[in-house]
UniProtKB/Swiss-Prot annotation:
GO terms for molecular function: unfolded protein binding. This is Prefoldin subunit alpha. The keyword Transmembrane helix does not apply. Belongs to the prefoldin subunit alpha family. The keyword Magnesium does not apply. Keywords: Chaperone, Cytoplasm. It comes from Methanocella arvoryzae (strain DSM 22066 / NBRC 105507 / MRE50).
């Protein structure tokens, strides 16, 4: 009877550990996506900064992917098209675009910190379960 109870406890423990492991993997993927978004915003901020001194008619190379570029000429150096999501963009001044990107970065950093906090809690609980599982090995 005690052996059956032990087996049930072990099965339950293993199921919990697998659930926590799955949750950790999902949280890590979420953290990676948030970090990629932060990197994207940083690239946009860097691009805005590098274009500030450029005037109308300034020529530059624009990346199109796969390490390829096209030649382009700046038509409106004081305006930036800012993506809002769902394939919707709005035209903003460079200063307004910078504020939008900085606000996005702040929100993304907050989301990343929250995600990492939950990830740490889940990792702690998983570690506790692993220590509990070690008791059954002895």
């Amino acid at each position: 009877m005690a052996a059956e109870a032990n087996e049930d406890q072990i099965r339950e423990l293993v199921a919990k550990m697998q659930a926590y492991q799955g949750r950790m993997e999902a949280l890590q993927q979420q953290a990676n996506l948030i970090q990629a978004s932060i990197n994207d915003v940083d690239s946009a901020l860097k691009a805005i900064t590098s274009l500030e001194g450029a005037g109308e008619g300034h020529e530059l190379l624009v990346p199109i992917g796969a390490g390829s570029f096209v030649h382009a000429t700046i038509a409106k150096p004081d305006k930036v098209l800012v993506g809002l999501g769902a394939d919707i963009s709005v035209e903003r001044t460079v200063a307004d675009a910078r504020k939008i990107f900085q606000a996005r970065r702040t929100e993304l950093e907050k989301a990343l910190a929250e995600t990492n906090g939950v990830l740490n809690k889940v990792a702690g609980e998983l570690m506790r379960l692993q220590q509990e599982a070690e008791k059954y090995r002895q």
